[in-house]
Amino acid sequence: MAGRSGDSDEDLLKAVRLIKFLYQSNPPPNPEGTRQARRNRRRRWRERQRQIHSISERILSTYLGRSAEPVPLQLPPLERLTLDCNEDCGTSGTQGVGSPQILVESPTVLESGAKE
């Protein structure tokens, strides 16, 4: 784990082991029984998963001293984004991937659906 001190690595490993143990202690529900029983088991399992998720976030913030949430990415305004399909877009799944094309003027096509 580049750029970290050894003590921080140990804290991170301890936190990950604890979170892994929490998730392993809540296996998926048994698919047997009546529909209502299965539904109740799934509902209780999902609630436990939500609790484990919130506990995991608290563990990470305590051990690492920071939030588990990523830093928000700054995006340009939606009205300035457009798809540029001038170059042979349909031949490969990787073509057209990259930085978005930005228009100076907002296109009128996007504004036609908004009624005031």
Swiss-Prot record:
Q: Which residues carry this modification: Phosphoserine?
A: S5, S8, S92, S99
Q: Name one GO molecular function term.
A: RNA binding
| Listed Pfam families | REV
One of the GO biological process terms: viral process
Q: Which UniProt keywords apply?
A: AIDS, Host cytoplasm, Host nucleus, Host-virus interaction, Methylation, mRNA transport, Phosphoprotein, RNA-binding, Transport
Q: Which residues, if any, are the signal sequence?
A: none
Q: Does the keyword Transmembrane apply?
A: no
Checking InterPro entries in the record gives: REV_protein
Region Disordered: start and end of each range?
23-49
Major location, coarse class? host cell
Position of sequence motif Nuclear localization signal and RNA-binding (RRE): 34-50
Skewed-composition ranges (Basic residues): 36-47
GO CC terms for this protein?
A: host cell cytoplasm; host cell nucleolus
Short sequence motif named Nuclear export signal and binding to XPO1, residue ranges: 73-84
Subcellular location, record wording = Host nucleus, Host nucleolus; Host cytoplasm
Stretches the record annotates as Homomultimerization:
18-26
Q: How is it modified after translation?
A: Asymmetrically arginine dimethylated at one site by host PRMT6. Methylation impairs the RNA-binding activity and export of viral RNA from the nucleus to the cytoplasm. The methylation site is still unclear and either occurs at Arg-35, Arg-38 or Arg-39. Asymmetrically arginine dimethylated at one site by host PRMT6. Methylation impairs the RNA-binding activity and export of viral RNA from the nucleus to the cytoplasm.
Assembly description: Homomultimer; when bound to the RRE. Multimeric assembly is essential for activity and may involve XPO1. Binds to human KPNB1, XPO1, TNPO1, RANBP5 and IPO7. Interacts with the viral Integrase. Interacts with human KHDRBS1. Interacts with human NAP1; this interaction decreases Rev multimerization and stimulates its activity. Interacts with human DEAD-box helicases DDX3 and DDX24; these interactions may serve for viral RNA export to the cytoplasm and packaging, respectively.
Task: State its role.
Answer: Escorts unspliced or incompletely spliced viral pre-mRNAs (late transcripts) out of the nucleus of infected cells. These pre-mRNAs carry a recognition sequence called Rev responsive element (RRE) located in the env gene, that is not present in fully spliced viral mRNAs (early transcripts). This function is essential since most viral proteins are translated from unspliced or partially spliced pre-mRNAs which cannot exit the nucleus by the pathway used by fully processed cellular mRNAs. Rev itself is translated from a fully spliced mRNA that readily exits the nucleus.
Q: What is known of its domains?
A: The RNA-binding motif binds to the RRE, a 240 bp stem-and-loop structure present in incompletely spliced viral pre-mRNAs. This region also contains the NLS which mediates nuclear localization via KPNB1 binding and, when the N-terminal sequence is present, nucleolar targeting. These overlapping functions prevent Rev bound to RRE from undesirable return to the nucleus. When Rev binds the RRE, the NLS becomes masked while the NES remains accessible. The leucine-rich NES mediates binding to human XPO1.
Q: Which HAMAP family match?
A: REV_HIV1 (MF_04077)
Concerning its family, UniProt says: Belongs to the HIV-1 REV protein family.
Other remarks on record?
Answer: HIV-1 lineages are divided in three main groups, M (for Major), O (for Outlier), and N (for New, or Non-M, Non-O). The vast majority of strains found worldwide belong to the group M. Group O seems to be endemic to and largely confined to Cameroon and neighboring countries in West Central Africa, where these viruses represent a small minority of HIV-1 strains. The group N is represented by a limited number of isolates from Cameroonian persons. The group M is further subdivided in 9 clades or subtypes (A to D, F to H, J and K).
Q: What is this protein called?
A: Protein Rev
Q: Which organism is it from?
A: Human immunodeficiency virus type 1 group M subtype B (isolate BH10)
The gene for this chain is rev
